[in-house]
Amino acid sequence: MDLSDAYENAAYIPEATGYLERWPVQAAAFRESHGARARLDLRYGPDARNRYDLFLPDGAAAGLAVFVHGGYWHKFDKSFWSHLAAGPVARGWAVAMPSYTLAPEARISQITREVAAALAAAS
């Protein structure tokens, strides 16, 4: 089994490159349209990628949803996925989207500690 291949899902998704081109544009448009209810680049730790975005609904939040981005721990960051907060935010939920140090710079154990710290900061 080629482990590199096992982590490259895009090769198995028809027209995957289209998503990779559209999503950053959609994410940026969502951040811009959300205005003051988009709290961007909030720090949760000392490392460069220890930041999260928080998207708030109108009025009091029903709760907090946290979206930990994919990329098999070695690519992407929070800014790639912002538009995926639209549904929960429209239904009254706050949404936190953390970035974290990527592999191979960080091991999975460090990444999970960083995600836990982001959860604590956002809660």
Stretches with model-predicted labels:
Residues F76-A85, A96-S123:
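Catalytic nucleophile-loop/oxyanion-hole region of alpha/beta-hydrolase
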Residues L3-A60:
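N-terminal cap/lid segment of alpha/beta-hydrolase-fold proteins
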Residues I13, Y72, L102:
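Short histidine/acidic/glycine/proline-rich micro-motifs that form metal-
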Residues A62-G71:
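Short beta-strand element of the alpha/beta-hydrolase
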